[in-house]
Curated annotation (Swiss-Prot):
Chain residue ranges for the region called Disordered: 166-186, 246-265
Record-annotated B30.2/SPRY domain positions: 210-420
Gene: RNF39
Record's subcellular location: Cytoplasm
Purpose: Plays an inhibitory role in anti-RNA viral innate immunity by targeting the adapter DDX3X and promoting its 'Lys-48'-linked polyubiquitination. Alternatively, enhances the cGAS-STING pathway activation by promoting 'Lys-63'-linked ubiquitination of STING1, facilitating the STING1-TBK1 complex formation and STING1 activation.
Organism of origin: Macaca mulatta (Rhesus macaque)
Catalysed conversion reaction: S-ubiquitinyl-[E2 ubiquitin-conjugating enzyme]-L-cysteine + [acceptor protein]-L-lysine = [E2 ubiquitin-conjugating enzyme]-L-cysteine + N(6)-ubiquitinyl-[acceptor protein]-L-lysine
Documented EC number(s): 2.3.2.27
Protein name per its UniProtKB record: RING finger protein 39
SUPFAM superfamilies: Concanavalin A-like lectins/glucanases (SSF49899), RING/U-box (SSF57850)
Pfam family, one: PRY
Pathway info: Protein modification; protein ubiquitination
GO cellular component: cytoplasm
Lineage: Eukaryota, Metazoa, Chordata, Craniata, Vertebrata
Classification via InterPro entries: B30.2/SPRY, B30.2/SPRY_sf, Butyrophylin_SPRY, ConA-like_dom_sf, PRY, SPRY_dom, TRIM/RBCC, Znf-RING_euk
KW Membrane (keyword) present: no
Length: 420
């Protein structure tokens, strides 16, 4: 298959392999210390890093369609994010002949056969088989080929090969601009020339259809499959937090707002709230829209230079401490990033880790939970560039809930609906 075959593959995905997906795709295309409120109690072992690049996949959509104007660029960060969808949980490699279980988990056919062993003879009682991820009973007869995933993996490989071509390394690909940070030339004069190009201001890309990546609808639809539809759990919220009526937004309540009664699940010191949905297996992601103090002052006309926007977003285990001082680090069952003073920090121990240097925090942060692999990663919600990843050596071992913290009445945190 060649790169020119991708449009036909996308059309086949919509009309044959994924009944009903075509219409969906068409719709898509139309306590405060000096160091900050969340860092004073960070204690415990630092997270281990994993250098292995994760994978990428894409789901079909018609090319050359009218796209959203906030489309991310098709670059290495996007490839790294999407590749997870093409990775078999058992072997850690790309899917080969994927099969789908009754519980909706997919595996390589050969990997699953090795895990389950040889089926017994017909005259003997069959041993029970279960999903390696969630443990639900899955009879052998329930196996079926995952044709859609097989095509997505093939498209993913084509995308990676295209990004590796010399033309892609130069920085452009059929109307889409590709960042070169992930594929710089070897050390020497070529690298110095590359950095000099970065120092020259470049105009922002046009918002016309031709200036958006051709494969953005494919990528967006594929990511949409993992995005969880979340709401907040008011029963866990600190008494000074104000939850919106649709339970998708949280901010610090203004002075004088009546406080609800305390409860065993509420945080009593950390201004935090958990999501109503918890996850004990699989891969899940959600996006949070933040608002920094500067933008809030601009909209309100106020000038309060002595105040900063403080927030943290991420994930917390069901065992996270609700009363008293909370250890905001992986040892305390918290994996989060903090926006403070116009900067973004990973809440690592013993000290937080500054992310992005002098760059301001992204306005939209994507949290990616891979329960079986013990990984919680954070991405720029627009460009899908990786910001930071916490990596454990074992599965997380308990239900994980989305975590939202804020102590600024002007800077609410908002869950981005899954259909956005």
């Amino acid at each position: 298959m060649s790169w020119r075959d991708l449009p036909r593959l996308r059309l086949w995905l919509k009309t044959e392999a994924i009944p009903g997906e075509g219409r969906k795709a068409a719709k898509v295309n139309a306590g405060v210390g000096e160091k900050g409120i969340y860092t004073a109690s960070s204690r415990g072992g630092p997270p281990s890093a994993r250098s292995k690049a994760v994978a990428v996949v894409a789901q079909g959509a018609a090319s050359r369609s009218r796209l959203s104007m906030d489309a991310p660029e098709l670059g290495p960060g996007l490839v790294e994010r999407l590749e997870q969808l093409a990775t078999c949980p058992l072997c850690g490699g790309s899917f080969e002949d994927p099969v789908l279980l009754a519980c909706e988990h997919s595996f390589c056919r050969a990997c699953l056969a090795r895990r389950w062993g040889t089926p017994p003879a017909t005259d003997t009682e069959a041993s029970p088989t279960a999903c390696p991820c969630c443990g639900l009973p899955c009879p052998r007869r329930s196996l079926r080929s995952n044709v859609r995933l097989a095509v997505e993996v093939r498209i993913s490989r084509e995308l990676r090969e295209k990004l590796a071509e010399p033309g892609a390394r130069a920085g452009r690909r059929r109307g889409g601009r590709i960042p070169t940070m992930g594929c710089l030339d070897p050390p020497g004069e070529d690298m110095r020339k590359t950095w000099r190009r970065f120092e020259v201001p470049t105009p922002k890309s046009s918002k016309s259809e031709d200036d958006l990546p051709e494969d953005y609808p494919v990528v967006k639809n594929m990511l949409h499959r993992l995005t969880a539809d979340l709401t907040l759990d008011p029963g866990t919220a600190h008494r000074r937090l104000l939850i919106s009526a649709d339970r998708r937004s949280v901010q610090l309540a203004p002075p004088g707002t009546p406080a609800p009664p305390d409860g065993p699940k509420r945080f009593d010191q950390l201004p935090a709230v958990l999501g109503a949905q918890g996850f004990g297996a699989g891969r899940h992601c959600w996006e949070v829209e933040t608002a920094d103090a500067a933008s809030c002052r601009d909209s309100s006309g106020e000038d309060e230079d002595d105040e900063e926007s403080h927030y943290a977003v991420g994930a917390a285990g069901e065992s996270v401490q609700r009363k008293g001082c909370v250890r905001l680090c992986p040892a305390g069952a918290v994996w989060a990033v903090e926006g403070r003073g116009g900067r973004l920090w990973a809440l690592t121990a013993p000290e937080p880790t500054l992310l992005g240097g002098a760059e301001p925090p992204p306005r939209r942060i994507r949290v990616d939970l891979d329960w079986e692999r013990g990984r919680v990663a954070f991405y720029d919600g627009r460009s899908l560039d990786l910001l930071y990843a916490f990596q454990a050596s074992v599965p997380l071992g308990e239900r994980i809930f989305p975590l939202f913290c804020t102590c600024d009445p002007r800077a609410p945190l908002r869950i981005v609906p899954a259909e956005s």
